[in-house]
């Protein structure tokens, strides 16, 4: 059976911090329109992998392809220009600004100026655009004109995810998007992640929350000691066996072929 082409693929990524190897010839393959969960213990290289794919760090070795073409990201700006958006744990939202202003942060819409110069920021256009986009994603927040500092943790996370999805053309990567959220707000974010996928974007989801991983992931990438040890189908493997492989209790080579993905 022919495998699906990769939307984003990396092979042999290496990154060291002094005597510590964060990425030890790490590989990853993300298929078009899927949610790929990346799991692993602390020190497995999950965050370093995301940073390498988003241009936040430059690996010492290895290759990255986007839609089949080789790419090199010298900075996060390069990755964003290529259509990859990333939501880190700090969210990078401005609490004192409105939801609409945060959605367009760094990409503000401006009114035409005199003699071709940049005009004033078009706040009304941004507000209208934000309302339309949030409605399309099913994000239920009372007013897009309210400040982010008035929102709950789950709502802030939704703003960050929606902003990434608004400008991504290929891939959205998320680092622990449901961390420290309660059940209701965690489910709200998971629903949004599903809707992002439904709009045709591929998603990489880094998470320690195994129930959340098994709820939304199409495939699970298991990392250990800086490299990929297995990719499994959450519909065919138990959570317990997945954790056993992740922690090194079970040899990934002993997994039955039908659970691999």
Set out the residue ranges of the language-model regions:
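Glycine-rich phosphate-binding loops of nucleotide-dependent enzymes
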Residues: 2-261
């Amino acid at each position: 059976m022919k495998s699906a082409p990769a939307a984003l693929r990396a092979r042999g990524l290496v990154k060291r911090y002094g005597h510590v190897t964060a990425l030890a010839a790490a590989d990853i393959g993300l298929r078009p329109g899927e949610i790929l969960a990346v799991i692993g213990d602390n020190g497995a290289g999950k965050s370093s992998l995301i940073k390498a794919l988003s241009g936040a760090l430059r690996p010492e070795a290895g290759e990255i392809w986007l839609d089949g073409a080789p790419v090199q990201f010298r900075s996060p700006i390069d990755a964003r220009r290529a259509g990859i958006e990333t939501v880190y744990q700090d969210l990078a939202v401005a609490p004192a600004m409105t939801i609409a202003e945060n959605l367009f942060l760094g990409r503000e819409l401006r009114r035409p100026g005199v003699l071709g110069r940049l005009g004033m920021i078009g706040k009304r256009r941004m507000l209208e655009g934000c309302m339309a986009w949030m409605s399309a994603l099913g994000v239920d927040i009372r007013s897009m004109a309210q400040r982010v500092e008035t929102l709950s943790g789950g709502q802030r996370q939704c703003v960050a995810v929606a902003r990434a999805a608004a400008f991504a053309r290929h891939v959205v990567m998320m680092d622990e998007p449901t961390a420290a959220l309660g059940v209701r707000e965690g489910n709200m974010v998971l629903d949004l992640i599903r809707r992002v996928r439904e709009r045709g974007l591929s998603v990489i989801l880094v998470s320690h929350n195994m129930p959340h991983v098994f709820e939304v992931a199409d495939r699970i990438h298991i990392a250990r000691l800086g490299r990929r040890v297995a990719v499994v189908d959450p519909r065919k493997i138990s959570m317990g066996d997945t954790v056993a492989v992740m922690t090194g209790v079970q040899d990934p080579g002993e997994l039955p072929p039908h659970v691999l993905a």
